[in-house]
């Protein structure tokens, strides 16, 4: 999965698709009542990027629906995975459940078209705080209450704060999550980071733990990209998708890796 990083404006969805991604990540900001209001990163953000692009959340979800509904004139067949990078650190811990309810209501209405032939993409709810595990519960219970539990087959989870893996697993246990788990690891492209924790996450994935997939962010250099692939990640988030596409054509990688497509279940751990 090539994950386009910080795609917060509608026009950037098409820009990143043209650059060769099959997945995009965007930032969700909440108001004081835990309502998701707009896609926006703000300052500081990655080096060499503009941090100030934004859209209203409902408009952005509608744009995503058009691009992932077969038969729509804006349809992009290769766009198969989203990462909702939810900026919940602005909320109190006891608002996490409400944030999950509000995320579910918005996604159900604007992306899933109220359960009527909505967008087909899979997506990851990425949470930056282990104490906000109840967001998952709020999301799941809201979708079930609408009579559409099958839509949860399209939803996965990630805690994105680089916490210790056992602590991450405990947070999932509290809300009964046993699958659909991606583990992220990384840092802004301005700073170097070792792959020690990525390797720990990959080991946990391959030992049959709760983690199904691992992604690394933000890899913009050829060397970092190769190191992440060598560590065995399933996805790489990048500002420059051509770098990863170039590396995947190199002799060392072209027979080991390929771009994921819609038939590849993002919740199933890959077994070579």
From Swiss-Prot:
UniProt keyword annotation of Transmembrane present: no
GTP-binding in keyword set: no
Catalytic reactions of this protein: an N-(acyl)-sphingosylphosphocholine = an N-(acyl)-sphingosyl-1,3-cyclic phosphate + choline; an N-(acyl)-sphingosylphosphoethanolamine = an N-(acyl)-sphingosyl-1,3-cyclic phosphate + ethanolamine; a 1-acyl-sn-glycero-3-phosphocholine = a 1-acyl-sn-glycero-2,3-cyclic phosphate + choline; a 1-acyl-sn-glycero-3-phosphoethanolamine = a 1-acyl-sn-glycero-2,3-cyclic phosphate + ethanolamine
Cell compartment(s), UniProt: Secreted
First-listed, main subcellular location of the protein, grouped into a coarse class: secreted
A GO molecular-function descriptor: metal ion binding
Gene3D superfamilies per record: Phosphatidylinositol (PI) phosphodiesterase
Similarity field: Belongs to the arthropod phospholipase D family. Class II subfamily.
Stated name of the protein: Dermonecrotic toxin LspaSicTox-alphaII1
Species, as recorded: Loxosceles spadicea (Recluse spider)
């Amino acid at each position: 999965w090539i994950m386009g990083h910080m795609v917060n404006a509608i026009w950037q969805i098409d820009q990143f698709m043209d650059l060769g991604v099959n997945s995009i990540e965007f930032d969700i900001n909440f108001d004081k009542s835990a309502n998701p209001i707009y896609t926006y990163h703000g300052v500081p953000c990655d080096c060499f990027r503009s941090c100030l692009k934004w859209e209203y959340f409902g408009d952005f979800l509608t744009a995503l629906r058009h691009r992932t509904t077969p038969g729509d004139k804006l349809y992009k067949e290769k766009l198969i995975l989203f990462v909702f990078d939810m900026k919940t650190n602005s909320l109190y811990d006891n608002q996490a459940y409400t944030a999950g309810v509000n995320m579910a209501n918005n996604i159900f209405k604007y992306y899933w078209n109220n359960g009527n032939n909505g967008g087909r993409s899979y997506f990851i709810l990425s949470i930056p705080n282990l104490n906000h595990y109840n967001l998952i519960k709020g999301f799941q219970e809201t979708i079930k209450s609408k009579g559409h539990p099958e839509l949860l087959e399209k939803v996965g989870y990630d805690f994105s704060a680089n916490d210790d893996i056992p602590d991450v697993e405990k947070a999932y246990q509290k809300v009964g999550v046993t699958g659909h788990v991606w583990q992220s690891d990384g840092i802004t492209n301005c700073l170097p980071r070792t792959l020690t924790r990525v390797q720990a996450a990959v080991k946990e994935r391959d030992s049959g733990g709760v983690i199904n997939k691992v992604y690394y962010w933000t890899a913009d250099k050829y060397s970092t990209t190769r190191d992440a692939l060598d560590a065995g990640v399933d996805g790489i988030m990048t500002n420059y998708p051509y770098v990863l596409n170039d590396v995947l054509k190199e002799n060392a990688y072209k027979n080991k890796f390929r771009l994921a497509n819609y038939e590849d279940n993002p919740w199933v751990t890959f077994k070579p």
